[in-house]
Amino acid sequence: MLTGVHLLLSYKCDSECDHCFVYSGPQAKGTFTLAQVKEALNQAAEIGTVKSAYFEGGEPFLFYPLMLEGVRIARNMGFKTGVVTNAYWATSQDDAQLWLRPLLDLGISDLSISDDAFHHGGKDASPARRALEAARKLGLPCGSISIEQPSLEEGASDGPSRGKPVIAGGAVLRGRAVDKLVAGLPRRPWQEFTECPHEDLADPARVHLDSYGNVHLCQGLSTGNMWQVRLSQMFGDYAAERHPICGPLLQGGPARLVAEYEFKHEDEYVDACHLCYLARRTLLDRFPQYLAPRQVYGLE
């Protein structure tokens, strides 16, 4: 049951992190207008089960007035709200509180701040640390997101992962991470990746929405376009087994997706996301409606 929508307020970001799911950066296009924000939230409300709306990106604080108005509208509609940011704007404690106080006044439920070396170079006195301190002083609900460079850990001593390489660090191999972070990591035969380890494709609880109208079940994997079909109808009619990408993934993971469409591929991959992302990138021109936008795959 769908309970949350995450608006990718913009793909634009002040940073260009190697691990970014959606290939954000300073030149990235795709920003909501105010009218689109209102329409997306109205469509979410029509479903009847959506309880929360997050604003993220990219970097939503780059479009500060739009972000605040989106949060205000969502709160007035009864949604719990959250914001995800890298806190580039927290240049001092005073400035951090200045930026955050309007969110406190609007009553957001969560502020998630990226605090890691990808965003801030591992500095102790990073903008993220300043923002977290400021949020706590204001009494704003907050938490940090910390992703590390992928690295090899010893395999699990028992259970289904016994003897298999374990990749630590928290980075998920989608988006720019596939092109920047897989070098040197151990790989396994593609046939081993028989399930999607992260997303509930059969019954998604949250989706990401972008300004192009794409409704992401996973970054770059869309169930349709909300500017063409309303969300209430889309999810009323949704059957994952009939989706050309989700169907095979449910039947047998990325390995099944590869076998289903019989395209040329490598013999080994780091993990299921690595295989799935590259398989989807190969299938872009075949299923442009469901694999979008192209920029999430590092393409124009």
Segments predicted by a language model, with ranges:
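Short cysteine clusters
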Residues: 13, 17-20, 218, 273-276
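Residue-level signal for mature regions of secreted extracellular proteins and peptides
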Residues: 6, 10-13, 211, 266-269
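Secreted/processed peptides and extracellular or luminal domains of membrane proteins
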Residues: 19, 23-26, 224, 279-282
